[in-house]
Amino acid sequence: MRRVAFPALLTALALPLSLCAVAPAQTALPTASPADRAEAREIFKQLIEINTTDTPLGSVTAGSAAMQKRFLDAGFPAEDVHLLGPDANKQNLVVRFRAAGPTTQKPVLFLCHMDVVEALRSDWHTDPFQFVEKDGYYYGRGTQDMKESDAALVSTFLRLHREGYKPRRDLILALTADEEGGKFNGADWLVRQHRELVDAAWILNPDAGGIELDHGRTVVADVEATEKVYSDYQITATNPGGHSSRPRPDNAIYELTAALDKLAAYNFPFELNEVTRTYFTNLAAQEKGQTAADMRAILAAPPGSPESAAAAARLSAEPSFNSNFRTTCVATRLSAGHANNALAQTAQANVNCRIFPGHSPEEIRLQLIGILADPKLEVKYVSDAGVVTHSAPDRKAMVPPAPIKEVFEPLTRITQALWPGVPVTPVMENGASDSIFFALAGIPSYGYSAIALERDDDRAHGQDERLPVDSYWKSLDFFYNFLKAVGGN
């Protein structure tokens, strides 16, 4: 991938975005028919009701095979529908919609993951693996992350094929395993072992970005331009232990919890980069009152000044803003002890960090040692494959891709036709996505889901995950028009 500085990225982004801002009134976009919607809903339901968790009950292969059957039944050539992977239970599906004839244009890849995080029936008001429509929402594990986009893109590929669409370049859809965790049977494996199947001019990854709503008001359309680095750390306290009837003054559990209290009270330093600065500049124009004033203050005041610090503190009360300002680290799992009547000899916590670009996992590991301030604690790095090591990698961030007009012009035009007047702005993704593997392989990746969600209704990975029905229909219309725009003809 061509490396560019953030200012160059934003300058280049300004051209297509400004062109769209002054364009004439949008003409009506083609929309999905009732039959198209019915098929898309059926596919969505089917995917939600196939458990694709990384558990003994889950199977990504079952979901991939179900979609493979749909493509083959629709008439896609078998040589263009690939079910493959190193793990029999975690097979990926790669489908190629071929160009009408010889072409010099490289393909476009739409990258989606099929796996979802575990959900317990006891935690939900509905069965997480049953597709439930209620009060204008679809409920089920994966309705936000990210089977809605899986289903929308599968149905769009099928619709275009049914309509006899003839693109000028190949369009590729990859439905992958192990994005939510595992041992790299998914996107990383495809890039390393089958580059020929997924090689592309650029990638659209719907696992990031989307439309932010505030009580029904359209605020901004986010397009991922970079992302934080995901890192896990194992914090361990040890002790000789003993009989619980004779407590010791030192205690592994107490020492670990005291250290975690320090972490809970700590805020990593406030930071902005050019992507987040542009994001808050655009957002300040949409916000009102104190929120807008605080955004303008953090942009104008020198970092660390009283004005900037006070504004950042107020904005940080909103988790989505806070995570755009700094590295975040939070305890996510605890384990301790071996018997109810014995003092714990070991207490461990997993601390999950999302690292602001410009900092490495090893730098944060060393910072955690200082924050916890207890030489008796061990702070180790946990790799994505679960390997625990004393030191961490030095990977600092996903390199932002060079902006491509053929991506941003149709993306902006179609988005603003569906959500009139919404500003389209580059953002930093606070989660982690499979885009990193393609970025490291030199393939530009952009994150955009075309899903509209209320800021306070982000339920991905959480209880009662749900998606507004209308948001799903709009994503169908977006992908249909976007695929035709980037595919040509």
Task: Please describe what each predicted stretch is.
Residues 7-20:
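Bacterial N-terminal signal peptides
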Residues 26-28, 208-219, 223-474, 480, ...:
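Metal-dependent amide/peptide-bond hydrolase catalytic core
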Residues 26-141, 160-169, 351:
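Acidic/His- and Gly-rich active-site-bordering loop/insert found
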Residues 33-41, 53-64, 88, 143-146, ...:
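Solvent-exposed, acidic/flexible segments
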Residues 36-44, 63, 67, 149, ...:
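Stable alpha-helical elements in mature extracytoplasmic
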Residues 45-53, 68-77, 155-162, 192-199, ...:
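Sec-exported extracytoplasmic/periplasmic mature domains
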Residues 52-55, 88, 100-101, 114-118, ...:
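Solvent-exposed loop/turn segments at secondary-structure junctions
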Residues 137-138, 144-222:
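Acidic/histidine-rich catalytic neighborhood of metal-dependent amide-processing enzymes
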